[in-house]
A protein has these predicted regions:
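An N-terminal assembly and electron-transfer interface module characteristic of large anaerobic redox
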Residues: 1-180
Length: 180
């Protein structure tokens, strides 16, 4: 009943996007897309304030990942496999805090509106395995470890959409989590 009273909405994962679009259409409430992860929460806060003042929706991680500034675009072989909004927010945090880039692999259906140029949309295990064959580092749900090469540095980032509740106790607080 009070959904239309918000000044702005925060879309922290792709499943919240359809609701944010409806609220924008019905009540002209802008939204910001991005997950507040360590090293990136300040950008999210800035975008929320900006969206509330301007009434314009925006994707927070585009201001970091699409600009190319703060990022070494060298072929560093870092991949994040996961849900698109969370993974792109982690990529932005890594760019801001460490000056490195990562390629996101999203195996889930997602809207093109919030997909950056560093995102690969794959639906099969074979496509993902081929893409990460030479990876130096893979950040992903533990179920993906089996398709990584032995020499790949694998960093577990459990997500219930992939491994269910098996690793629930190991899901980190992303406001405290350091990726690399």
């Amino acid at each position: 009943q009070k959904a239309g009273e918000a000044d702005v909405n925060l879309v922290i994962s792709s499943v919240g996007f359809p609701a944010a679009k409806v609220l924008e259409e019905r009540f002209s409430t802008p939204y910001v897309i991005g997950t507040p992860v360590k090293g990136f929460a300040g950008i999210i806060a800035e975008k929320l304030i900006d969206a509330a003042w301007t009434g314009k929706s925006q994707t927070a991680y585009f201001s970091v990942t699409s600009s190319g500034k703060n990022i070494s675009r060298a072929a560093n072989g870092i991949y994040i496999i996961g849900e698109s909004v969370i993974s792109q927010s982690l990529t932005a945090a890594m760019a801001l805090k460490q000056g490195i880039d990562a390629t996101v692999i999203c195996p889930l259906e997602t809207e093109p509106e919030y997909i950056g140029e560093n995102v690969l949309l794959f639906s099969s295990e074979e496509e993902i395995k081929a893409a990460i064959a030479e990876a130096k580092t893979v950040i992903a749900d533990p179920i993906y470890k089996t398709i990584c090469a032995d020499e790949t540095n694998f960093i577990a980032l459990p997500h219930e959409a992939f491994s269910g509740r098996i690793y629930r106790k190991e899901i980190p607080n992303l406001m405290e989590w350091v990726t690399i």
